[in-house]
Amino acid sequence: MKVLFGVCSWGLGHAVRDLPLLKRIIRRGYEVTVVGKGRSLDFIKKELGEKCIYCEIPDYLPPYSEKSFSVAKFVGRFPIYLREIAREHKKIKKLVESNGYQRIVSDSRFGIYYPGIPSYLIFHQLRFIAPGRVRIFERCTEGFNYLSLDNFNKILVPDLKQEDLCLSGDLSHNLHYFKESKVEYLGLLCDLKKMDMPEDIDYFISISGPEPQRTILEQKILPQLPLLKGKIVVALGKPEEEKEIFYHGARIYSYLDRKTQQEIMNRSRLIISRPGYTTLMELAILGKKALLIPTPGQTEQTYLASYHMRKGNFYSVSQEKLDLARDVVEAERYPGLKVNNIQPEDAEEKFMQVVFGG
């Protein structure tokens, strides 16, 4: 069977959560073509090498601004957003007609589908949530997603169905328009395993996200490293580079492969990172405490950070007000997410069952 798999390029998180699914598809013996761009595609290439075919097709800019959010800006960008989705779909249509795929899986790319071929969307943001919770805006965005996603056989949400245990909150729960038969809650996707080892790293700092905010966070954090006491490891989220340096006693990597990141996260007492959804799944599976720094302008991360701070799981601070020495003390007081007996392998198995029938 030939499978087309689209990966979103809005940071590395989508590529990271897709990795265990791609590995399962490959193990099944299917031929996989990965569509992506930039660092996300670079990451997949480094992890899977010649096991896949790769095709670079750019996706579209996210429908939010880089610095601040306003409903007017969001709505104003929608016509551009729709044109970009249509342009993406036109390229995908040519690719499908040239290669004859039997299944299509897309992570958060609305234009990667083909009529008549079973197409599935991995997506955890079925409604957009603006700061201040403008309810009519939220209903409109859910309605837009509902109509836009009708091209897919099912929406695969990488979250737990139980509202008291879920990670995404109102992003993908308490829905008004989506029918239960259309949405499949897979569980948590994470290729990292919890390991029994001493926590001999005090702080692991993961700097990530779309540019220019990734670089801005790097420039904000690195000068503050001397103010932290203990052993520090930093990952810069740049898979196109392979560098390792020491800076004010901290070990800094341009990029960590998944095996190394698994070990370092297991050894760390506190994780400092963006509240990207993939990161939250990793924190939950590993049972780690964290300091969360939302990417400015990304309403999803702002909501998730606020949601989990309100639930008493993690401490969060804005990028602008970040004071590492002060904020790590606050973050230590929060216990992290507890999802006992949740196995990522179950989510992978459910994905294979839904998409391939077993």
Residue ranges and their predicted role:
Residues 77-80, 313-358:
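Leloir-type glycosyltransferase catalytic cores
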Residues 69-111:
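Conserved nucleotide-sugar donor-binding subdomain of glycosyltransferases
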Residues 130-212, 236-239:
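A nucleotide-sugar donor-handling region in carbohydrate enzymes
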Residues 115-131:
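Active-site proximal beta-strand in glycosyltransferases
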Residues 2-9, 27-79, 251:
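Conserved nucleotide-sugar phosphate-binding/catalytic loop shared by glycosyltransferases and other
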Residues 22, 184-270:
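Donor-nucleotide binding loops and adjacent catalytic segments primarily
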Residues 261-303:
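A donor-sugar binding/catalytic signature common to diverse glycosyltransferases
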Residues 7-19, 212-215:
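A short, glycine/small-residue-rich beta-strand->loop->alpha-helix junction that serves as a flexible
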